[in-house]
Each structure stands twice: as C-alpha cells, then as structure tokens.
Regions:
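Glycoside hydrolase catalytic-domain context in secreted enzymes
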Residues: 24-257
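Hydrophobic h-region of N-terminal signal peptides that target proteins for export
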Residues: 14-24
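Terminal low-complexity, poorly structured segments
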Residues: 11-12, 16, 47
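Compositionally biased, low-structure terminal segments
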Residues: 6, 17-18, 122, 163
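Bacterial N-terminal signal peptides that target proteins for export
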Residues: 1-12
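Helix-centric, low-specificity signal for extended rod-like, repetitive segments
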Residues: 2-3, 18, 40, 202
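Intrinsically disordered, low-complexity regions
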Residues: 1-2, 17, 50, 104
C-alpha cells in the first residue's frame, strides 16, 4: 500500500499540474504548494483515479450525465477523457468534475492531434523530409491554437519512435530512422504545442510517445516486444526522448498496450 501511495505521489502531481497549468498564471512555487495541499485531502482511490483516461469519443451531453463515466467523474475516479471534443460538450462534462466531485479537480481532455487539427498538414514522416524546423514548429503551433479553441488541452504528440523496419505500420507517425533529426523535430513540436510552457489559453500540453524503444518492435509487429542492447538503446533510440524532455514536454507516455 505504501509503495502504491508513493507512486501516486510521483505521478498524480504531474497530472494535476498539467490540468491546472494550462490556464493558470501561478508561479511554480504556488502551484506546488497548491498541489501538495490538495493531495493531502485526496483518498488513495482519488489519487489512482487521476490515472484513468476513459475513451469517450462519441459521448453526448445527455449520455455524459447519465452514464457510468459520469458517476466515476463525480466520485473522483477519472483524471481525463480521451477523444471528446467540442466546447459545449467538454464544458458540460467539466462541470461534473468541478461542481459535483468532492474536490472539484478539473479534467484533462486529450486527443491525438498528430499533424494538424482543423488545418491538416503533411503526416509527420512527410514533414520530417523538409528538415525545416521553423515550419514544423509552426504546424504544431497552429494545431495547438485550433485544438485549444475546441476544448482540447492535451495532445499525444510528438511521436519520436526511431523507425527502421518498414513492416511496422506506424512508421508514418514519426520522423523516420535518424535519431538526430528526430530529436530536432521533437524539440520543435514541443515548442509549437506548449509555447511559453502552457501559460496561454491557446497552448496545449504535449506528450512524447510512445513508450521508449517502441519503434524497434520485433518483426515490425504492433504491440510486440523489443530486444536490444543498452548501447543501441542510448546511441540510436533515446536521443529524441531526451530532447523532448529537455524542451520541457509536459507529459510522457508511460506505456503502450
């Protein structure tokens, strides 16, 4: 139980900070103090609940208020929703969390904003061929402006998996086989999405993905295992992840399954 609590103490602040910092103007010290005080009030179930991200792409206002997800939100068992968009719908669901849950913790609303939102840009593999970091950053900036206007606060991008096996069906989601290029693009996209580190309403939180080394899945099979040496891991696959973290990415995909 103590180990679970310690893990929640590490992870939950990131989720809570991400939720609140998208629209907040508080200093990091004030925010840390606010989160510490809030976590002292949370039950273990509520802390674990912050790790839940149900998929609700087709949810409507009426369904949201009568569904099991709605009950879970009210109990503080949901940290965010995936694939729900539209300001009106998001507002109604957010009110469930803020007004009807015990602690009023707002939800995150995440979506795969991969290469544009309303304005569609070339796929990431295509963008990488330009080697134009300014244009790539601008594409992420535009996507953030459009997505945030529709209520989205979190994108599962950039995808920084180094991909060298064309049999893998997700090669087009990343920047290809070059670790250096992947690292430069990772930094550019994090800057584009997050801008001034999510201090404005038109900036959204980026999530570097997928779980490290996923681009080297055995035989190019999706969701397969990876087997490689530590030398190869650090020299060929980890550079883009490190670059995204150094650029201040707001979240990291901790698993892919």
């Amino acid at each position: 139980m103590n180990r679970i609590f310690q893990r929640m103490k590490q992870v939950a602040p990131m989720l809570l900070f991400a939720t609140l910092s998208v629209h907040a103007q508080k200093s990091p010290q004030d925010m840390n103090r606010f989160i510490d005080n809030l976590m002292k009030k949370m039950t273990l179930e509520e802390k674990i609940g912050q790790l839940n991200l149900p998929v609700t792409g087709e949810i409507t206002t009426g369904q949201a208020k009568s569904s099991d997800i709605s009950a879970r939100i009210k109990r503080g068992e949901v940290g965010g929703l995936f694939n729900l968009k539209g300001v009106a719908r998001i507002k109604d669901v957010q009110e469930l969390a803020v007004k009807e849950s015990r602690l009023g913790i707002p939800l995150l609303f995440g979506m795969d904003v991969i290469h544009g939102y309303e304005t569609i840009f070339p796929i990431p593999l295509g963008l990488s061929c330009t080697w134009d970091m300014k244009a790539i950053e601008e594409s992420a900036r535009i996507a953030a402006i459009e997505a945030s206007a529709d209520g989205i606060s979190w994108t599962f991008s950039p995808m920084v998996d180094v991909s060298r096996d064309p049999r893998w069906g997700r090669v087009s989601e990343g920047s290809g086989e070059d670790p250096f290029l992947g690292a430069e693009i990772a930094k550019a996209m994090v800057r584009g999405y997050q801008g001034g580190q999510m201090k404005r309403n038109d900036e959204i939180m980026a999530c570097v993905k997928h779980f490290a080394l996923y681009g080297a899945s055995e035989a190019g099979r999706d969701y397969n295992t990876v087997d490689m040496s530590r030398q190869r891991m650090f020299n060929e696959y980890m550079l883009p992840y490190q670059a995204a973290v150094d650029a201040g990415v707001g979240s990291v995909m901790a698993s892919i399954n």
